[in-house]
Amino acid sequence: MIKKHYYSWQDIETMCISIVNQMYTDNWRPDYIVGLTRGGNIPATIISNMTGIRCEALKVSLRDDEMGPESNCWMAEDAFGYNKEPTNILIVDDINDTGATFNWIMKDWQSSCLPDDDKWQSVWNNNVRFATLTDNLASEFTEHCAYTCHEINKSEEDVWLVYPWENVGQYG
């Protein structure tokens, strides 16, 4: 039987404070924050409100949406520094589960803006960083999350995490 862990709204606020503190400890500040729909939007907005940094949304739904993910070329150009200096971007999701979402972003952004340029190797974990409330150590995301609050290892323990925005009734 799968073990379930329920996060409270207080847990989420505490984790967002932790991410902000980790950024300040690193002396790193994003120019903007990208919240991934659906799970990353809420923590990204909370972090945005705590820091006064603007927040954007990016739809990367690899399993729940027939339309699939959207590509935001302007974010890739900002990350790369296509027309100016590279922009610091914090990409936020609730969980790095399999790693597919973050890997898709890296592949999509690089393929949309000078894909063969070696400069991309210095983009990731420098001016573009990933943050999650929970990081699955068994994920296939090889770059690692710069900022995280809880670590799990789903290859050792099968756990289902329930965030407060997922624990509401369905209407209609």
What do the PLM-derived regions correspond to, one by one?
Residues I2-H5, D26, K107-G172:
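PRPP-dependent phosphoribosyltransferase catalytic core
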Residues C16, G40-A44, S48, F102:
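Short, highly selective alpha-helical patches that border small-molecule cofactor pockets
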Residues N21, T45, N49, K107-S111:
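Short, well-ordered alpha-helices that flank and scaffold nucleotide-derived cofactor binding pockets
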Residues M1-R29, D65:
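Active-site-facing substrate-recognition patch
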Residues N49-L90, D97-D108, K119-S122:
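Short, glycine/charge-rich flexible loops or terminal/linker lids adjacent to PRPP-binding catalytic cores
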Residues Y32, E56, L90, R129-T132:
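A structural signal for isolated positions on well-ordered beta-strands in alpha/beta enzyme cores
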Residues W28-T37:
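Short glycine-rich phosphate-binding loop at a beta-alpha junction
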